[in-house]
């Protein structure tokens, strides 16, 4: 038998074996999981979409999670959480999620991390054990602390560099042609612009203009999302097998990031070693997140400082946090601005605001005060988050102890995951007029009517959170980078509208393509295009 014939025969036998054995293996793992590892939910916990007293979800209800999650969440809100009732929902793969009414939120957030853990809940959602190789990157998320404590206090200086990088990225990825219209894939183009701008913040110059580094970051972000979905949907017993397989390509791209970062890392670590760690940073020292990470590690995590793979993985996760949600938000904002322009004159209104507050010179310094005055741009961003938020639940916790009861008498079993619905409240007709219509100035109109009473309308700003508005979470674990995102999205929209004319292709008839649901995630329309031309 020839080698090629043998290989073909082996491949055919392997495929036949796999087609039988893999489903059997998954089924066997499911039975073992149900018998020995499944969480025992209390008998008085109702199941969404099922008759009273039912203890297991039907395939129909599970299928709805994947194909009609928006309606499933709306029914859950109307039938249970709106009425102050706790309920169980099917989730990704074999997961179940306990959904709590908003009236419980204050009590849930009052529990310490050792009882209701935010970090453990996020580890389950993102599956960092397999994407980054260790749970410490979320269990000990000290780079996030640096964003909250150090970077947010230096926003204006940080954003000077990001603004400069945005101009460079727009010119590179969109162009400067003032004569001809150009049609672009919006999501893919904005993703590269934001990766470049975010990299100016995370690693600084020159890596933020290194195409190989930026492409590797892009692929790592996609890999983290894919791993969270696929590994998270896998039965827990099989994750040690499938997790490493699913993340093979992701690990290769993290290695590419490490190789690109290594020269910068070595140079900076050497410079730090020549300084006394107690000294203040040199005035010429880089002012990016990576430098802050190295300085912190020098003082507080010396083992990690000299562990390039670990620092590279922390940087990769920081890039993911800085890019993923912002890309989705800005893509949706641009689609919404263009689609609402015919009714609300959105583009002209926003251009006037930029002219009045920032001025026509794109080199003008952006300040916290100026950003706070841009309430129309702020409203455009908040309305986009209200209607097109990628995440539709918030305030995730894992139950680590027995004995915690909800206000309606449900005991939360140890090991369960709890969260709160977001979208049904953000699209509630009792709160919002015409709730599924995009109204760019919905929030700015309210704020303009009460300009002297800033406190009364402060909860309507883009960065504000509440139990009824959860895109950034709420409470002590709400997104620490949202203040940077506030600067960034306003700078992007300002530069785009002041320097480019934008419109939809003729075949769109002035209407934005519909967003697409992927289970419970709401994604921008794939392949959505806009026509764009540089203004003279």
Swiss-Prot record:
It comes from the Eukaryota. The lineage of its organism: Eukaryota, Fungi, Dikarya, Ascomycota, Pezizomycotina. One of its GO terms (biological process) is mycotoxin biosynthetic process. InterPro entries: Cyt_P450, Cyt_P450_CS, Cyt_P450_E_grp-IV, Cyt_P450_sf. Pathway: Secondary metabolite biosynthesis; terpenoid biosynthesis. GO terms for cellular component: membrane. Heme binds at residue 479. It is found in: Membrane. GO terms for molecular function: heme binding; iron ion binding; monooxygenase activity; oxidoreductase activity, acting on paired donors, with incorporation or reduction of molecular oxygen. Belongs to the cytochrome P450 family. The chain crosses the membrane at residues 20-39. This is Cytochrome P450 monooxygenase pbrC. Keywords: Heme, Iron, Membrane, Metal-binding, Monooxygenase, Oxidoreductase, Transmembrane, Transmembrane helix. Its main location: membrane. Its cofactor is heme. It is a single-pass membrane protein. Its EC number is 1.-.-.-. Cytochrome P450 monooxygenase; part of the gene cluster that mediates the biosynthesis of the sesquiterpenoid aspterric acid (AA), an inhibitor of dihydroxy-acid dehydratase (DHAD) effective as an herbicide. PbrC catalyzes the third and last step within the pathway and converts the alpha-epoxy carboxylate intermediate produced by the cytochrome P450 monooxygenase pbrB from (-)daucane into the tricyclic aspterric acid.
């Amino acid at each position: 038998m020839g080698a090629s014939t043998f290989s073909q025969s082996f491949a055919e036998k392997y495929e036949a074996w796999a087609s039988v054995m893999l489903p059997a293996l998954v089924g066997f793992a499911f039975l073992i999981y149900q018998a020995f590892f499944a969480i025992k939910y209390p008998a008085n916990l109702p199941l969404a979409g099922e008759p009273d007293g039912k203890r297991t979800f039907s395939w129909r209800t599970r299928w709805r999670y994947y194909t009609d999650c928006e309606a499933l969440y709306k029914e859950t809100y109307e039938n249970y959480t709106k009425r102050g009732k706790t309920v169980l929902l099917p989730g990704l793969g074999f997961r179940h999620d306990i959904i709590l009414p908003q009236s419980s939120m204050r009590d849930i957030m009052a529990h310490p991390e050792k009882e209701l853990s935010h970090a453990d809940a996020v580890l389950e959602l993102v599956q960092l054990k397999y994407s980054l190789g260790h749970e410490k990157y979320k269990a000990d998320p000290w780079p996030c602390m640096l964003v909250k404590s150090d970077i947010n206090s230096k926003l204006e200086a940080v954003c000077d560099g990001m603004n400069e990088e945005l101009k460079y990225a727009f010119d590179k990825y969109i162009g400067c042609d003032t004569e001809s219209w150009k049609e672009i894939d919006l999501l893919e183009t904005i993703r590269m612009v934001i990766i470049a701008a975010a990299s100016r913040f995370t690693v600084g110059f020159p890596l933020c203009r290194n195409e190989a580094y930026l492409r590797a970051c892009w692929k790592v972000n996609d890999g983290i999302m894919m791993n969270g979905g696929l590994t998270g949907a896998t039965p827990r017993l099989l994750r040690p097998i499938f997790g490493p397989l699913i993340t093979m390509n992701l690990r290769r791209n993290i290695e590419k990031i490490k190789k690109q970062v290594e020269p910068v890392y070595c140079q900076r670590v050497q410079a730090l070693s020549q300084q006394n760690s107690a000294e203040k940073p040199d005035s010429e020292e880089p002012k990016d997140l990576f430098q802050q990470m190295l300085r912190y590690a020098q003082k507080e995590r010396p083992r990690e400082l000299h562990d390039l793979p670990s620092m590279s993985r922390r940087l990769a996760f920081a890039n993911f946090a800085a890019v993923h949600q912002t890309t989705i938000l800005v893509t949706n904002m641009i689609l919404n601005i263009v689609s609402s322009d015919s009714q609300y004159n959105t583009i002209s209104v926003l251009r006037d605001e930029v002219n009045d507050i920032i001025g026509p010179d794109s080199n003008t310094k952006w300040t916290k005060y100026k950003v706070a005055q841009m309430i129309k741009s702020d409203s455009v961003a908040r309305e986009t988050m209200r209607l097109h938020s990628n995440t539709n639940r918030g305030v995730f916790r894992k139950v680590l102890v027995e004995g915690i009861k909800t206000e309606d008498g449900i005991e939360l079993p140890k090991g369960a995951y709890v969260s709160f619905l977001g979208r049904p409240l953000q699209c509630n007709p009792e709160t919002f007029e015409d709730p599924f219509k995009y109204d760019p100035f919905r929030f700015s109109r309210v704020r303009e009517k009460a300009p002297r009473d800033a406190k009364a309308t402060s909860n309507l700003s883009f960065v504000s959170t509440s139990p009824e508005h959860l895109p950034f979470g709420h409470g002590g674990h709400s997104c620490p980078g949202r203040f940077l995102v506030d600067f960034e999205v306003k700078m992007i929209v300002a530069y785009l509208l002041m320097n480019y004319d934008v419109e939809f292709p003729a075949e769109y008839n002035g209407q934005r393509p519909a967003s697409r649901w992927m289970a419970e995630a709401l994604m921008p329309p794939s392949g959505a295009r806009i026509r764009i031309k540089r203004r003279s």
